Amino acid sequence: MFQFVKKKNEFLKFARLGSRAFTQNAQKTHSKGSNIALVSSSLLSVGMIALYYNVYGPSLSAGTPKEEGLHFIQHDWPQSKVLSGFDHASLRRGFQVYREVCSACHSLNLIAWRHLVGVTHTADEAKQMASEVEYEDGPDDEGNMFKRPGKLSDFLPPPYPNVEAARASNNGAAPPDLSCVVRGRHGGQDYIYSLLTGYTEPPAGVEVPDGMNFNPFFPGTQIAMARPLFDDAVEFEDGTPATTAQAAKDVVNFLHWASEPELDIRKKMGFQVITVLTILTALSMWYKRFKWTPIKNRKIFYQRPIK
């Protein structure tokens, strides 16, 4: 009887060992299969991304400076700093440059007279400038269109009535709208400034066709737009010397504001958000320590009851 029980215990022990070994082998096999599946799916994902980028990704080409244009010169713009905004005196001068020079060919379709209030001009000055422009309105009670003086709600008038008229007046190339030109160009204000101040005589051996102008910062180095800025082309009311560089700087600042009129507001809001979040983070850390310090430092002792 004792031998039977002993053999039975040995059999159960052997069965337990076999079951444990089978379970471990199954876990290893499952883990190995999971790793293989994970590696396969990762390789498949990387391959699909590489295939998509190869088919639809941008093509790289090594262009010469003549084909791509010279790299723009980087400048220190106040609005590009974290804690500073637009120079409003420069914005006022820049609007004057746009109005007296650039508006002859380029439009600002997204800027209304009311947008200038508090930025470049007072409300009375903006109303006065708007009233000097006649806008077509209507129809009246008889169904006829009529002309009226401009209001603050009107947008700045375009130089041409439509795109076709713009093309016809510029040898088939319509001048672009300048509302978002700074944000829509690689290099932003640095590129626009370099382009405006980069007009020069072509080097020896370079032929420029009629109707084209040489500018090394423009792709292809030949641009249809003639040089727009010259020294003393405008007369600033604040007495600032109207050099080509100064006029280009001011008009680029104004065009940057036209592309991002909410930039200063975003910076102020971001600074306020960071300040509030910093205070809330400090308060939450203090409250966490206030609540958890007694709990973490608490010691519990078991004292046996005295009989």
UniProtKB/Swiss-Prot annotation:
Membrane topology classification: Single-pass membrane protein
Cofactor binding note: Binds 1 heme c group covalently per subunit.
Residue ranges annotated as Mitochondrial intermembrane topological domain: 57-269
Residues in compartment: Mitochondrial matrix: 288-307
Domain Cytochrome c: 89-259
Highest taxon of the lineage: Eukaryota
Cofactor: heme c
Transit peptide: 1-56
Catalytic reaction list: a quinol + 2 Fe(III)-[cytochrome c](out) = a quinone + 2 Fe(II)-[cytochrome c](out) + 2 H(+)(out)
Positions of heme c binding: 102, 105-106, 225
Any one GO molecular function term: heme binding
TM ranges: 270-287
A Gene Ontology term for the protein's cellular component: respiratory chain complex III
Alphabetical list of SUPFAM superfamilies matching this protein: Cytochrome c, Cytochrome c1 subunit of cytochrome bc1 complex (Ubiquinol-cytochrome c reductase), transmembrane anchor
Keywords: Electron transport, Heme, Iron, Membrane, Metal-binding, Mitochondrion, Mitochondrion inner membrane, Respiratory chain, Transit peptide, Translocase, Transmembrane, Transmembrane helix, Transport
Broad enzyme group: translocase
Chief place where the protein resides: mitochondrion
Entry's EC annotation: 7.1.1.8
Localization terms from the record: Mitochondrion inner membrane
GO terms classed as biological process: mitochondrial electron transport, ubiquinol to cytochrome c
Chain's role: Component of the ubiquinol-cytochrome c oxidoreductase, a multisubunit transmembrane complex that is part of the mitochondrial electron transport chain which drives oxidative phosphorylation.
Oligomer and partners: Component of the ubiquinol-cytochrome c oxidoreductase (cytochrome b-c1 complex, complex III, CIII), a multisubunit enzyme composed of 3 respiratory subunits cytochrome b, cytochrome c1 and Rieske protein, 2 core protein subunits, and additional low-molecular weight protein subunits. The complex exists as an obligatory dimer and forms supercomplexes (SCs) in the inner mitochondrial membrane with cytochrome c oxidase (complex IV, CIV).
Family: Belongs to the cytochrome c family.
Cross-referenced PANTHER family: CYTOCHROME C1, CYTOCHROME C1, HEME PROTEIN, MITOCHONDRIAL
Protein name: Cytochrome c1, heme protein, mitochondrial
